[in-house]
A protein has these predicted regions:
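C-terminal helical cap(s) of enzyme catalytic domains, especially alpha/beta-barrels
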Residues: 51-68, 125-150
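Surface-exposed amphipathic alpha-helices with a cationic face
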Residues: 1-7, 33, 83-91, 137, ...
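Extended, intrinsically disordered, low-complexity segments
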Residues: 76, 138-163
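Catalytic cores of alpha/beta
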Residues: 20-35, 87-92, 102-119
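Glycine-rich phosphate-binding active-site loops on the catalytic face of alpha/beta enzymes
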Residues: 40-48, 101-102, 108-135
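Glycine/Thr-rich beta-alpha phosphate-binding loop at enzyme active sites
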Residues: 33-34, 38-92
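Short beta-strand/loop segments at the ligand-binding rim of alpha/beta enzyme cores
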Residues: 5-18, 88-98
């Protein structure tokens, strides 16, 4: 296997689509845990599905008909369920970067609590600007202290409610 002969010099993450099946998620998690050159997985990328948009009243019906990748808040629940499954499979043996629907400290707290070691933002940066990062970090830090945790690492995978 040529890939396993690579020396681990840089962190390498595999970014997965929210359309991934449970079977493929389990396979990729197992491969990632057993390959030295893979540091972790990124869950998840944009989706081409619009299914979650039909569940809410939509003032912007054009979003349902739009083609291309959908990102941001509509992905939050789907992404969270995939992160939770991956964490249960991997049991903390590889890093998980949570992506999709992170707009505030509560969203960040939830993703970390179900298993994400780190987070990636995009849509909230576009709509709220770079200060959203400070807002998220401040709220997250306050909530971690409120829950009696020493640091963010103590939250990873603990399934602690934000409320």
């Amino acid at each position: 296997n040529k890939l396993s002969k690579l020396k681990k010099k840089k962190n390498t993450f595999i970014k997965l689509s929210p359309e991934i099946s449970d079977e493929n998620l389990e396979y990729i998690c197992n491969v990632s845990m057993n390959e030295e050159f893979i540091s972790g997985i990124i869950l998840t990328n944009t989706t081409i599905s619009r299914e979650m948009l039909y569940k809410k009243p939509m003032n912007d019906s054009w979003k349902i008909k739009e083609i291309g990748g959908l990102s941001g808040p509509p992905l939050k629940n789907l992404t969270n369920s995939i992160i939770k499954k991956a964490y249960e499979i991997c049991k903390g043996k590889i890093k998980i970067i949570g992506v999709g629907g992170i707009s505030n400290g509560k969203d960040a707290f939830e993703k970390i609590s179900i298993g994400a070691n780190a987070l990636q933002l995009y849509t909230s940066l576009v709509y709220k600007g770079p200060n959203v990062v400070n807002d998220i970090l401040e709220d997250l830090s306050n909530k971690i202290r409120e829950k009696g945790l020493e640091n963010v690492n103590d939250l990873v995978g603990k399934n602690i409610s934000y409320e």
